[in-house]
Design a protein with these regions (language model features):
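Conserved ABC ATPase signature
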Residues: 237, 241, 261-318, 323-336
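C-terminal lobe/lid and adjacent interdomain/linker elements of RecA-like ASCE P-loop ATPase modules
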Residues: 340-417
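Conserved P-loop NTP-binding catalytic core
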Residues: 40-121, 134, 141
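N-terminal pre-Walker A segment at the start of P-loop NTPase domains
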Residues: 1-15
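Catalytic acidic motif of RecA-like/P-loop NTPases
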Residues: 12, 25, 43, 330-331, ...
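Phosphate-binding glycine-rich loops of NTP-binding sites
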Residues: 23-60, 304, 309-315
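Phosphate-binding P-loop
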Residues: 16-22, 315-318
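Electropositive, glycine-dotted interaction segments
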Residues: 97-261
C-alpha cells in the first residue's frame, strides 16, 4: 500500500482532517460536502512533484482558494502523509555492506501565508524514515542477510533555510550519515519556495508515491472524437486519448487478449475492439458487436457507458501508477453492472498492488462497496468538511442489524446520525 494515513489543516473546505486509508476507499457525501476537495489534496501533492510548489498553488486557484476561506492566513496550511511503502538502501562501511530497510515514512510540510499579498514561507518541511538494518554478506553468487537488532530513524528537515540530516541508529550499527548522503548534500541551502519533496533528498520510491498519483474523471464525449497520434502514452485524466492507449494495447497479443476478456466479461455483446488510423495521422477506436458480425461501430456511435467501462478497465488493469483516483465511475453505467464494477476495483486493489480511491453518489455502488471501505464526507455547522467512517458508528450498526441496507441509510441521509 502507498498511503496509509493523511492529515491536513487549513486546506480548502477542511479545517482539520485525519484519516486512515485502505487499499480500496469509497468516498460518499452530499453535494458540496467536500469530496472534490479531498481529491484536490492528492492533486496538489502530485502537482508539487511535477510542476513545483509555486505552480501547484497557482493550479489550485492561488492561495485564496487553496487555504480555507474562513481561516485564511491566521493558521498555516499543512499536509502530513504517512506511507508504509517499503524500500531499501545500501551503505558501504569498514565492516562490509549494511542494508537499510525503510518500512514507514512520514512527510509533513506547512506553509504560512502573508496576510497581504501572495507571499508565503515554508515553516515546516520534514521527512522521517523508520528503518531496520541488515548486515549483508556475499557467499559466492548469493547475498546472505542478517538482521541487526534495533531500529532507527533517518530524519531530513529544513532548518533556517538549510538541509538538516539526523541519523538516529542503534550503537551496534556502524553507519554514518556520510555513507548515505555525500558531504556536499549535507546542510545545503534550499531555495525559498522549494520543498524537500522536489529535491534529491527525497528517495525515488517515496517521491513516486506522489508523482504517480493518477486522477480520472472520464468524459465519454472526448474519446468519441479522433485523437492525434502524437498524444501521451498514458491515459489522460479525462480519457480523451483512449484511442492511443487502446492502439498500444491491441498491438501486443497478450495485452489484447486480456483487454478483450475483461471487456467481454462486463459487456458480453462486444465481439472485438480495434483502432483505426486515418490519413491525417489521427486515431479512432472502434468495436464490433455480436449483432453486426461484419461491421465495426466507430467510437462516435458507441454508447457513453461502453466508453466509460472501457476507460475504467484501461485505468485499472493497464496503467502502471499505483495510486488511482476515479471520480464517479458509475456514470452512464446500468445499475445491473455496478456490482461487477465494484468487484473489479476490489480485485485490482488486492491483486495489482494498487490503492484505489473512488468518489460516488450512487446507492448501488455504496451497497456493494463494503461498509469497511466507505468514508463519509459531510459539513459541520461551521461549514468545515469532516470525514468519518460509518462502520465505526454504533447507530449504523444497529440499523444494519435490523436489515436496513447501507444504501438505504445513505439515501435517507441516516449515515450522519
Amino acid at each position: 500500500m502507498s498511503i496509509r494515513r493523511i492529515e491536513v489543516k487549513n486546506f480548502k473546505s477542511f479545517k482539520e482532517l485525519k484519516i486512515d486509508l485502505g487499499k480500496f476507499n469509497v468516498i460518499i457525501g452530499a453535494n458540496a460536502s467536500g469530496k472534490s476537495n479531498f481529491v484536490h489534496i492528492f492533486e496538489f501533492l502530485r502537482d508539487i512533484t511535477s510542476s513545483g510548489l509555486d505552480n501547484a498553488i497557482s493550479m489550485q486557484g492561488g492561495r485564496e482558494y487553496l487555504r480555507n476561506m474562513n481561516i485564511g492566513a491566521s493558521e498555516p496550511l499543512s499536509i502530513k502523509v504517512v506511507s508504509d511503502q517499503e524500500f531499501g538502501l545500501l551503505g558501504r562501511t569498514k565492516v562490509g555492506l549494511i542494508g537499510i530497510k525503510t518500512y514507514e515514512a512520514t512527510y509533513e510540510f506547512a506553509l504560512r501565508f502573508n496576510k497581504r499579498g501572495s507571499g508565503f514561507r515554508i515553516v515546516k518541511d520534514e521527512l522521517s524514515q523508520k528503518c531496520k538494518f541488515l548486515k549483508l554478506e556475499r557467499k559466492g553468487r548469493k547475498i546472505k542477510e542478517k538482521e541487526i537488532p534495533g531500529e532507527g530513524e533517518i530524519l531530513i528537515s529544513r532548518s533556517n533555510g538549510r538541509v538538516k540530516i539526523v541519523l538516529n541508529i542503534p550503537p551496534n550499527v556502524p553507519l554514518k550519515k556520510e555513507v548515505i548522503f555525500p558531504p556536499f548534500l549535507q546542510e545545503e541551502k534550499l531555495p525559498e519556495h522549494k520543498l524537500l519533496l522536489e529535491t534529491p533528498y527525497f528517495p525515488p520510491p517515496l517521491e513516486s508515491i506522489f508523482s504517480e498519483i493518477s486522477i480520472h474523471d472520464f468524459d465519454p464525449k472526448l474519446p468519441k472524437k479522433a485523437t492525434p497520434i502524437t498524444g501521451k502514452a498514458e491515459l489522460e485524466g479525462n480519457g480523451n486519448n483512449l484511442s492511443i492507449i487502446l492502439k498500444n494495447i491491441t498491438e501486443n497479443r497478450e495485452k489484447r487478449r486480456k483487454l478483450f476478456n475483461l471487456v467481454k466479461d462486463l459487456l458480453p455483446f462486444v465481439e472485438n475492439l480495434d483502432v483505426e488510423k486515418f490519413a491525417d495521422k489521427s486515431l479512432l477506436f472502434k468495436l464490433k458487436e455480436s449483432y453486426f458480425k461484419t461491421q465495426y461501430l466507430p467510437a462516435s456511435l458507441i454508447s457513453d457507458g461502453t466508453i466509460n467501462m472501457t476507460a475504467l478497465i484501461v485505468a485499472l488493469y493497464f496503467e502502471k501508477k499505483p495510486f488511482v483516483i476515479i471520480e464517479e465511475p458509475e456514470r452512464n453505467i446500468h445499475p445491473s453492472l455496478i456490482s461487477k464494477v465494484v468487484e473489479m476495483m476490489k480485485d485490482v486493489s488486492q491483486t495489482q498492488k494498487k490503492q484505489i480511491v473512488v468518489t460516488t453518489h450512487n446507492p448501488e455502488f455504496v451497497k456493494y462497496a463494503g461498509l469497511e471501505n466507505i468514508l463519509l464526507v459531510s459539513r459541520n455547522e461551521a461549514g468545515f468538511s469532516t470525514i468519518s467512517r460509518p462502520a465505526d458508528k454504533e447507530e449504523v450498526k444497529t440499523f444494519l442489524k435490523n436489515d436496513i441496507g447501507i444504501e438505504e441509510l445513505y439515501i435517507q441521509n441516516l449515515l450522519e446520525v
